[in-house]
Curated annotation (Swiss-Prot):
InterPro entries: SfsA, SfsA_C, SfsA_N. Signal peptide: none annotated. One of its GO terms (molecular function) is DNA binding. This is Sugar fermentation stimulation protein homolog. Belongs to the SfsA family. It comes from the Bacteria.
Length: 231
């Protein structure tokens, strides 16, 4: 999918209060940008990193700039957690994610579980398929790791996906790696061992674990290929 244009390049000064980041643009202007990512952004929120911001045309937004990309270890990384659902939908429709082809309808944010909303609900003659997407930005030694902070929400989603399988439905946990230097995907056991245990339990109980890597450029983010999952 195409990124909003133009994007404004700058240098990260600091990220704070989870959703805010101060950035010095290349013209010397310092702006406070919205950060659409609730994780720790380990390795991606270091002062001095080069970043790309979009800018909303809305006159009512307190922070019109939004942080879209960061350059980490020489690689552009997509940090916007609103993109994975859109990327997954696009890749399902164009056949990139072949494991999820053949469904007649895709709906988003459908209520399920205990007060949750599934990212994507696929339906067709083969039944229902519940798809939970996760944005991955952390890479160590060529392996993409999730989560980058303890994720009670992620743990809850795995339990709910297992329940969907018990009810006779198909359930998929889909990791979207928004950087090109990840060659495989693994749970970040050192960061959230409970999540790692639940991910393995989910896989053993019928939840399908998929990982796809995105090609990230200054103008576009698109899923390009599946990655092996190391459990």
């Amino acid at each position: 999918m195409k990124l909003p244009q133009p994007l404004f390049q700058g240098t990260l000064i600091r990220r704070y209060q989870r959703f805010l980041a101060d950035v010095e643009l290349d013209d010397g202007t310092v702006v406070t940008a919205h950060t659409p990512n609730t994780g720790s952004m380990m390795g991606c929120a270091c002062p001095g990193n080069r970043v790309l911001l979009s800018k909303s045309a809305s006159l009512t937004r307190k922070y019109p700039h939004s942080w879209e990309l960061v350059q980490a270890d020489g690689t552009w990384v997509g940090i916007n957690t609103q993109l994975p659902n859109l990327l997954a939908r696009e890749a399902i429709l164009d056949g990139t994610i072949s494991e999820l082809s053949g469904y007649q309808q895709i709906r988003g944010e459908v209520p399920y579980g205990s007060g949750s909303r599934i990212d994507l609900l696929l339906s067709g003659e083969q039944g229902l398929c519940y798809v939970e997407t996760k944005n991955v930005t952390l890479v160590e030694d060529g392996v993409a790791l999730f989560p980058d902070a303890v994720s009670a929400r992620g743990q809850k989603h795995l339990r709910e996906l297992m329940e969907m399988v018990r009810q006779g439905h198909r359930a998929v946990n889909l990791f979207i790696v928004q950087r090109a230097d990840g060659a495989a995907l693994a749970p970040a056991d050192a960061i959230d061992p409970v999540y790692g245990r639940l991910l393995r339990e989910a896989a053993q109980n019928g939840v399908e674990i998929l990982a796809y890597r995105a090609e990230v450029t200054r103008t576009e983010v698109r899923l390009e290929r599946a990655l092996p999952v190391l459990l």
